[in-house]
Regions:
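Ligand-binding loop in jelly-roll beta-barrel domains
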Residues: 97-122
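Histidine-centered catalytic micro-motifs
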Residues: 59-66, 99
Length: 126
């Protein structure tokens, strides 16, 4: 397997070879106060690891990207299409394209794994 062209952090397009990385080798970004984000980007999909401080709120929003979310650690109060759901470590959620959703982290640090297709261009540098 190869890391492909460009840098070694998985952030780049044009990969046609398989890649194998570890989260510990992927740079951490800080898109907002209380949020850490790591991204591993492919040609048509991406996976992001988010770490949220307790009680942080992500406002309700929608986007054209299909999204799968895995709760790796903690508990989250999700608001999905006007309904409230509590998700805990081990739970998996699916958000179809243009699904209205948001979340409030509960009383502990939360780690979420989000998979998006197509790529979230708004997350990419440049």
């Amino acid at each position: 397997m190869s890391d492909g062209p460009g840098d070694n952090n998985g952030n780049g397009n044009g990969y046609n070879l398989a890649r194998h990385l570890n989260w510990s080798n992927i740079p951490v970004e800080y898109p907002a106060d209380g949020i850490e984000r790591q991204m591993f980007v492919g040609n048509r999909m991406m996976i992001c690891r988010f770490r949220f401080k307790p009680f942080l709120v992500t406002p309700e929003h929608d986007h054209p990207h299909e999204q799968m979310t895995i709760v790796e650690r903690g508990r989250v109060r999700f608001f999905i299409e006007g309904k409230e759901q509590i998700a805990k470590a081990g739970d998996v959620l699916h958000f179809p394209s243009n699904c209205w959703h948001g979340a409030t982290m509960m009383d502990e640090e939360v780690v979420l794994i989000d998979i998006f297709s197509p790529l979230r261009e708004d997350f990419l540098p440049g």
